[in-house]
Structures are given as structure tokens and as C-alpha cells.
Amino acid sequence: MGHQDILRRASFAHVCGDSIIAAIAGLALYASFPPVGWWWLSVPALALFVSRIDEARAPRALTVTFVFGMSFWVPLIDWIPLAVGTTPPWFVLALVQTFFFVGWVIFARWTQLWRWARGPLAQAFLFALTWAGVDAARSRWPWSGFPWGSVALPQVDSPLGHLAPYGGTTLITAVVVFLAVLVRRAFAARDAAVLREHWFSRPALAVIVAAAYVAPLAISLPNQAENGMLRVGVVQGDIALPGAEAYSREGEVTENNVRASLELASSPQVTGRPIDIALWGEGSVDRDPLAFPAIGQAVDRAATALDAPILIGYTNLNERDRVKNWLAVWEPGTGMDESTRYSKHVPVPFGEFIPFRDVIASFATEVAQASKDMEAGEEPPLMTVQARDGRSIPLAVGICFEAAYPLVIGDGVARGGQAIVVPSNNYHFRSSGESAQQGQLLRMRAMEYSRSAVQASTTGHSYVIRPYGSILASTGTEEAATLAADIPLRTSQTLTASAGERIPGAVMVATLIIAILATATVIGQGIRASARARRASGH
């Protein structure tokens, strides 16, 4: 066996070993999210991943990153096949999200060509900034993006979650990656940049990590009411599976929610202390209650029994033959005012609308070919309800996956929303981790904007969340259930709410600038290397 063969085999073995470690890191990062929920694994998992790529040559770094990304994304979104009925979209979405990781590692590695960027703090800063920028970009593009899987989200249960009001997921993401790089540098077996410093360099890095991790606990997350309390009832009527068949039977889903509402109305938690409003899930009314009088009468029966308005969800077709996904407030005895409705702003690509329909329908499933696109709404994500004492209470609203989009929920808060309400329909996902992951996203929104938040699901999980992100009350999945709780209403605006898209926008611009400069450095080095080669050859 020749020397070159030995080197090739050693290199292959090295790549395989690194890939196994990267897979472990990806699975560990997945485990920091629901349904596992070991949030404390986020930083170690990323540190382990960084240890495999920060000194690797480009081919190995790309391979390792691909393995890490797929090991993370595939189990995280294993609920996709439950919703679409087939596995290819699951792997395609995981692949697309992994490519964002691969893009990040290219530019992150290139920054290490700058001599000043090789120290622990400089590397941590550049890796953190660019990861946060790429994360912000993939959460917004293509189409509406996919905000799932941000490494900030498990921090709702960690001290780093206390940073949410001061920079949202963008800031927390950057801090998580920053700490992960420092952990990697502090515990690396060989690190020339650290070894050149004093003997205490590694302990100092460890102290910095520990201090930075616990320091946010000094930041208080307020919970007190600024405009009194609102007593809410959450109605989870449940849907018989398969859900499509349940929706095909007129009134079945509506009656499930009516039945649960009547049980709530007669329960001690409501008879002793009446609610101000009941919250039903997305699609909780299976027909347009204005077009189907019997459906409207059923909803009114529930509202009358509760002696409170009900926030309902339903769909209909508009004049352009497009689906509209509505939230509306139904007042007992008087019905609903169409002028105060909200329709979903961010339909889910390939789920609620088909991009490039003419092309895709030619080879898509029969359902995709026959389905109608959902049209995005234009109404402000803010609805006003009347409390029992006569107060007008503005609520920031979103529908289902819109809990993942600060652009929607943040807009509602900036417009004066004093609490956040997100009706959801999770029957597609059954008892998978999707609903808990969505609840985690809503917990982050509550912390970012210092608002109480409620997820009212048709099938679970439903959550009542405090302004600092902890869960006040919750339900299980695939069951009929109700909740009643008092939530504090708040009016002050956090920095995250006031800044809006400016924080992630600035980080994305900074990331783009770094990527351009790093690319220019690589090109410049290539040009200089070619010139030296020509001189050496005498040409």
C-alpha cells in the first residue's frame, strides 16, 4: 500500500469519525427541543459541532455540517408526514434548512483567514453574528421562511431567556452560539491561539461562559398587570380522526366545541367567577356561521351559556375563489361583526398555498392539484374585545404557525395588544411534538413582548402562558378539554417590540457584509497564489 493510499484511508476515517460526532451533536441539539425538552443541551451540542468544523478543510467541514444539519432537522420535524401524508416533503424541508447551515459554515470558516479573527473571543463573535444572521434570513425566506428550529427557542427555560425583551430570538441565538464557541475553545485538546496566552486562558474562558450564562438571571421579567386582569376560558373541543372526514360532516366540529363550552359554563371554575371571553381554536367552526344559520345558532348557544363573547375560527371562500382563514368575535345574542375580523397573514407554503402552482400541480399529489390556495389577509393583527366590566381590551392575534413570526405577533403588540392570542388547529399532527414546539414558540413571543399569551387548539396542546414565559395552565393532545385562567394585561413596550425588524435586519446586513469581505479575502488569496505560482514557474 502506497503512502497516498494510507493518507486517503486516514482522511476517510477522519471524515467518518467527525461525521459520527456531528450526528451526535445534531441529535443532542434536537433533544433540547420538545418533545424531549433538555434545553441545557443546546450549548454543548453546538460546541461539539463547532469542534468538528472550525479547523477542518472545506470538504470535511461541508460534509460534517450536512450530517449535523440532517441529524437535527429530520427528527425535529418528524410531524411533516402526518400533515402531508407522504415523506418526501419532510426530507426536502430538512434538506433546505440544512443548506442554510452549510452556507453558514462556508463563510464562517472563511472568516478564520483573517489573523485577528482567530482568537477565542473574535471567533466566537464572528461565528455568533453570522449564525444569527443566517438564522434570521432562513426564518424569513423563501416565501415566509421557516422560523422553527432556532437555537434561541429552548432558552425559554434557561437563564438566557431573560434576554428576550432586549433583542428577541436574534440576540439569544447569537449568545448561544457565542458561548458554544467559547466552550469549544476552553476545552479543546489543542488550541494554539489559547496556548500562546497565559496558563489561565482556558479557565478564564470557562469563567466567562459560566458568568454569561447565569448573568441574565439578574434581569427581571415582569409579570404584574398594567391594565388589570382578563379572565379567559379556553375551549379545546377535539376532532375525530381522520380530521378531513370530520370536517366533511356539517356541524360536527362546531358541536364538539359547543359541547365543551357548555361543560365549561357549568364548571365551578366559571360559575363562581365568570369569564370575560372564551377562546376557541383555529377552524373550530366548520362552516361560515353567517352563511350557515344552524352553525351560527350553535355558536350563539355556547356564547349564551357562557354569557361571554367567543373568539371563533372558520374559513370561507372569497370572491376570487381563494380560501380565507378567519378569526372573529361572536357576541351572545347579536352574533359577529364582519368588520372586526382578522384573516391569516402568513399562509403556510405547500400546506395552505402552492407556490408556482401551474408547475407543481403537474406532478404533485391529487390533494395539491385539487386544493384551493389560501389568500393572505391584510387586516391588522389586533382584535378588541369587551371585558365583563366594560373595558375595551386590544389583543394581538395570530393563527397557528403565525406564533412563529415576530412580524405578525410583534405588529399586534406594537399596535397596542395587551395580551397575545393564537388559535390553532393541530389535528394534522396528532400527538407528535409539533404542538409543544409551537407552544415553545409562543412562550418566546410572550417573553419577547412581556405579554400573557394563549394558544387555543382544537385538539391540543392548549396553553395559558405568563408574560415571563412560564406555563400557567395547559391541556393534553387528542382530547376534549377546557381551561379557565386570569391573565395580566400589560401595556408597556419592550425593546424587542419597539425595534421590530430593525434588530434582525441589522444582523442580516452585518452578516452579508462579513460574507462579502470573506469572499473577497478568498478571491484575493487565490489571485496572489496564482501570481506566485506563475513567478515560480518563470512565466
Which positions does each model-derived feature cover?
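Hydrophobic residues at beta-strand termini and immediately following loops
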Residues: 91, 151, 235, 342, ...
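CN hydrolase (nitrilase-like) catalytic-core segments centered on the catalytic cysteine
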Residues: 83, 97-101, 128, 285, ...
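Short, conserved active-site loops that position catalytic residues or coordinate cofactors/metal ions
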Residues: 33-48, 72-77, 236-237, 272-287, ...
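Structural detector for hydrophobic anchor residues on beta-strands
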Residues: 230-231, 325, 381, 449, ...
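Soluble catalytic regions of membrane-associated enzymes that act on cell-envelope
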Residues: 217-351, 372, 382-392, 397, ...
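Membrane-embedded alpha-helical bundles of multi-pass enzymes
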Residues: 2-220, 431, 442-446, 457-462, ...
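Active-site catalytic loop in hydrolytic enzyme cores
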Residues: 79-88, 115, 139-167, 323-406, ...
